[in-house]
Amino acid sequence: MTSYTFSRELRLLTPAQFKSVFSNPIKASSAEITLLAIPNTEQHPRMGLTVAKRFVKRANQRNRIKRVIRDSFRLNQHDIPHLDIVVLVRNGVMEMENAEINKLIEKLWRKLSRRYNG
């Protein structure tokens, strides 16, 4: 049975793991969200997430955005190649509804997969 959890093994946890993604990444971006990725040696993708206070002032809004992105990753993890991915949230995402964020991030998952595969 396919698991749709977002367990600890699917997360980037240490600063070193985040830093490695920033060196020569594969990119997929929109005006509001940027995905940076590098191939990993695991049998599954891993994700790290940053939402800066500079762009999203209120904690409840940052948490909402992170929750929507994590949920999208959780549901799409089996369609994403074995990559370490860092999601950077930029200005403008705060005005978006949850459904809009979800639609945008799913489009970016597909774009990232295409760039990695060919």
Swiss-Prot record:
Lineage: Bacteria, Pseudomonadati, Pseudomonadota, Gammaproteobacteria, Alteromonadales
GO molecular function per UniProt: 3'-tRNA processing endoribonuclease activity; ribonuclease P activity; tRNA binding
Entry-linked InterPro entries: Ribosomal_Su5_D2-typ_SF, Ribsml_uS5_D2-typ_fold_subgr, RNase_P, RNase_P_CS
The name this protein goes by in its record: Ribonuclease P protein component
Top-rank taxon, per record: Bacteria
Subunit structure, interactors included: Consists of a catalytic RNA component (M1 or rnpB) and a protein subunit.
Keyword tRNA processing found: yes
Keyword annotations from UniProtKB, A to Z: Endonuclease, Hydrolase, Nuclease, RNA-binding, tRNA processing
One record GO biological process: tRNA 5'-leader removal
Pfam family, one: Ribonuclease_P
EC id: 3.1.26.5
Substrates-to-products reaction catalysed: Endonucleolytic cleavage of RNA, removing 5'-extranucleotides from tRNA precursor
Function comment: RNaseP catalyzes the removal of the 5'-leader sequence from pre-tRNA to produce the mature 5'-terminus. It can also cleave other RNA substrates such as 4.5S RNA. The protein component plays an auxiliary but essential role in vivo by binding to the 5'-leader sequence and broadening the substrate specificity of the ribozyme.
Entry GO CC: ribonuclease P complex
Family: Belongs to the RnpA family.
SUPFAM superfamilies: Ribosomal protein S5 domain 2-like (SSF54211)
